[in-house]
């Protein structure tokens, strides 16, 4: 309901309404100071007429029901809109069910077939001694998957990928004297394009290409296939091969699991009896090609069973790595969260996290379960997600990736991948007090990524994605503590390529449940539905702003919009409209009151008027406009919010909300710690409007969270003011961008929120404290110009 009242000092609202909106009535002025008592109920005490809230349809039974689209409301409806809303709801439901099925049916990983690995499998001769192919279906897959130009490979054209895959497939077909026409087409493609290798971006060179490709050329020559290898590009590849083979510690290779097990194919001088002790579940580091090469030499039964399982799953072909279960479970959750649609899949995500934790080790993890080789990319992603889901993971996982203050992708290697450093940077921001190795990792990875950005060199060796520079740039510009959920989703919707993103292993490959157009379609649809709800609410906020004369206190409409944006970017779900509006209006009123230059007597009058729910008049019979408007607006808004929450949750929170405001006003009047008081008021308002029972407010964990949140929010407000008014005198840590005290407070809060304890609060309640602190951090950390651009992008730029 909107309130319309005059700026004249002697107007009150009567109980008569027009169309549900209270009408105006003139009240004669009295001649002496007194509290108004006309026999009529003051407008700020009027009961709110029952009004239909915007209703929503949900498709889950989660604690916070997920909203699909708005039903008919009293003020916005046409037959066309209703049809569109129903169609949107149905499309959303279908997409959610499709993704839910994918998550519920995850096993060892869904990914594309690698022609290169399939060719190595096809080369295996029957271990029974018949002289025939051991895996004829792999040869069949090769024969059925040649492109018209004669090549094999991923649909994304890279010469490295196409030439390696094509030569491997030609060698396999030639070995078994099959399809000479396909062999000829493949050779023609290779000879016409091999010179292009020297022009390719070296960052996109597949894993082990400099060893695998020359080995294939040698095998091809034994079959009578001549491949031109005297070009400058080929000579460079041979030089890299010589250097790499020279560095391989053969004694170490046979003694303990290393990443070298992933690329055994074509290597000479191997002691297979020793190497067989290093396989797990029949495979060598989940590599079909490496395992096929081992089977050729050992006829090992476990290796045979591993390959048979993979061939059956992928209909004759095999992928570049299998299984990739840890990779798939973790990266899928990460994508769903950053796209802003994880709330649809909370049970499924919880199962993914339980699965990941089951195979987590103190040394970290790799792309597959139970491997004895770990990498920083998977370990960082696993650590971050498990910690954010309150699983007790240890920072010891990062020790083997650190040496002398530097961090590497794989223990013992000195190379760095952008995504590895990017994910360790993200993980390092979820640190608890005393996590020194994470602080070191943050410093190192931030410096590395900043330098790459300055040099415009953000190209990764593991993935070709739509906008990796954008992803890295967002992480550097908006750290975890400042990353509001809707802001992150809005940017990631532009960075995420869906099906078009491709990974780089031994060949290019697709992770079908990680990079998925279905995720993208749902995310875009959901974002635009939420945005439409937010825009509708913004219209109502503007009406409230004008009707309550908030603008009379010189609070600019842009400040109003910024306050709503902060709330909507944090509590964005349509069904949480009550919480969002309560937060926004509370923040707006706080800013309005704090902007007034009132002397102590005026402050006291405002506090007294609010406390008693009545308005004082001056000696000449007139009421002071500023004082009265502040009190009237505040009383009215508290009543309005209380009425809305009672209608939504069936609970009357008026007394508690009034008390929360009274406590803040008392602090304001007495010049107390307003930063802490402001945070406490916002927390209380958010919890009351969410329907949280007041009994939880006295819970020891609640009190601890409130104390830490209030303290860090106060520090952030002071920091923000210093940045604005005395930037030269504001000491800023070069790594974190704030102060040591603020970072320590945020670390303490993160630990309280994301660790479980006996007699704990529920996760949703705990995370709301972090949400409030995050909003303070965001406004203190980000420049006003950046925030202005974020406001427009999040609230008004539709995702297409």
From Swiss-Prot:
<feature type="binding site">
    <location>
        <position position="377"/>
    </location>
    <ligand>
        <name>Mg(2+)</name>
    </ligand>
</feature>
<keyword id="KW-0460">Magnesium</keyword>
<dbReference type="InterPro" id="IPR050148">
    <property type="entry name" value="Terpene_synthase-like"/>
</dbReference>
<keyword id="KW-0150">Chloroplast</keyword>
<dbReference type="GO" id="GO:0009686">
    <property type="term" value="P:gibberellin biosynthetic process"/>
</dbReference>
<dbReference type="GO" id="GO:0010333">
    <property type="term" value="F:terpene synthase activity"/>
</dbReference>
<dbReference type="GO" id="GO:0000287">
    <property type="term" value="F:magnesium ion binding"/>
</dbReference>
<comment type="similarity">
    <text>Belongs to the terpene synthase family.</text>
</comment>
<protein>
    <recommendedName>
        <fullName>Kolavenyl diphosphate synthase TPS5, chloroplastic</fullName>
        <ecNumber>5.5.1.29</ecNumber>
    </recommendedName>
</protein>
<dbReference type="GO" id="GO:0106242">
    <property type="term" value="F:kolavenyl diphosphate synthase activity"/>
</dbReference>
<keyword id="KW-0934">Plastid</keyword>
<dbReference type="Pfam" id="PF01397">
    <property type="entry name" value="Terpene_synth"/>
</dbReference>
<keyword id="KW-0809">Transit peptide</keyword>
<dbReference type="InterPro" id="IPR001906">
    <property type="entry name" value="Terpene_synth_N"/>
</dbReference>
<keyword id="KW-0413">Isomerase</keyword>
<comment type="pathway">
    <text>Secondary metabolite biosynthesis; terpenoid biosynthesis.</text>
</comment>
<feature type="short sequence motif" description="DXDD motif">
    <location>
        <begin position="375"/>
        <end position="378"/>
    </location>
</feature>
<feature type="transit peptide" description="Chloroplast">
    <location>
        <begin position="1"/>
        <end position="75"/>
    </location>
</feature>
<dbReference type="GO" id="GO:0009507">
    <property type="term" value="C:chloroplast"/>
</dbReference>
<dbReference type="InterPro" id="IPR008949">
    <property type="entry name" value="Isoprenoid_synthase_dom_sf"/>
</dbReference>
<feature type="binding site">
    <location>
        <position position="244"/>
    </location>
    <ligand>
        <name>substrate</name>
    </ligand>
</feature>
<feature type="binding site">
    <location>
        <position position="375"/>
    </location>
    <ligand>
        <name>Mg(2+)</name>
    </ligand>
</feature>
<keyword id="KW-0479">Metal-binding</keyword>
<dbReference type="InterPro" id="IPR008930">
    <property type="entry name" value="Terpenoid_cyclase/PrenylTrfase"/>
</dbReference>
<feature type="binding site">
    <location>
        <position position="461"/>
    </location>
    <ligand>
        <name>substrate</name>
    </ligand>
</feature>
<comment type="function">
    <text>Involved in the biosynthesis of labdane-type diterpenoid including cleroda-dienols, and peregrinol lactones and furan derivatives, dopaminergic diterpenoids that can bind to dopamine receptors in the human pituitary gland, have probably ability to lower prolactin levels, and are used to treat menstrual cycle disorders (e.g. premenstrual syndrome and mastodynia). Terpene synthase that produces kolavenyl diphosphate from geranylgeranyl diphosphate (GGPP).</text>
</comment>
<dbReference type="InterPro" id="IPR036965">
    <property type="entry name" value="Terpene_synth_N_sf"/>
</dbReference>
